[in-house]
């Protein structure tokens, strides 16, 4: 019995060692993402790893697939639109600031603007605010402000990562051609594009977070849910495999319509699939209802 147990232990150690070696080999190229420049052969290495992926777990394969997609993605693909930005005025006093943080903006970092949202002056970190709340002496919001960076919506995500590293900041304000604030992107947004959604203790579930299967022919979905996720549930293709124009169900609708459609607008994606806009504003699409003539492949909610 002892010999058998020793063999099992040795076998387990060998398996663990192989797994560790494999993971190191898999993720070593990803270190390049956090350097100031991505090597020219970065994606060729990733492609070779993906080709030889028989021993990889599903999560590992998904990360590699997302890495390859990341090459062509821009800030515009993942940014939080202007209409969804929560920010605080520079003139806010400490009592108002404390209340705003608790009630409206449950995040570790909060944008600060002077006058209008087109004049973002930086952001504050929650830990700096806590220190100020403790002392309450000579409070000046300006003293707490940290720097952000400016980026165009067309900037590649990999270039944004490198710039964030150089500038040592986690927040970028996206500026339109007229110099106005178009959106916001954080390093967390970029990492979610790579490894999937990252929930932390400040994230709160809402009706827009993911999707809900209402019945065998209806799904209510956040516009930011990826098309591939919904395709798996529906059992039908919503886009061609080589179509890189969009990744989310909202992107599909915007591509089909050419603009942000009004609530109640319906489009037929195929003979079996109809998409109806159930929530939107003039600048962004928030929620859609997907209706099928045939039943869903499998009914589940997220």
UniProtKB/Swiss-Prot annotation:
It comes from the Bacteria. GO terms for cellular component: plasma membrane. Gene3D superfamilies: 3.30.465.10, CBS-domain. One of its GO terms (molecular function) is flavin adenine dinucleotide binding. InterPro entries: CBS_dom, CBS_dom_sf, FAD-bd_PCMH-like_sf, FAD-bd_PCMH_sub2, Ion_transp-like_CBS, Transptr-assoc_dom. Residues 79-141, 144-201 form the CBS domain. The keyword Repeat applies. Keywords: CBS domain, Repeat. Pfam families: CBS, CorC_HlyC. CDD domains: CBS_pair_CorC_HlyC_assoc. The keyword Repeat applies. It is not know if this bacteria is hemolytic. Belongs to the UPF0053 family. Hemolysin C subfamily. PANTHER family: HEMOLYSIN-RELATED, MAGNESIUM AND COBALT EFFLUX PROTEIN CORC. This is Possible hemolysin C. It comes from Rickettsia bellii (strain OSU 85-389). The gene is tlyC.
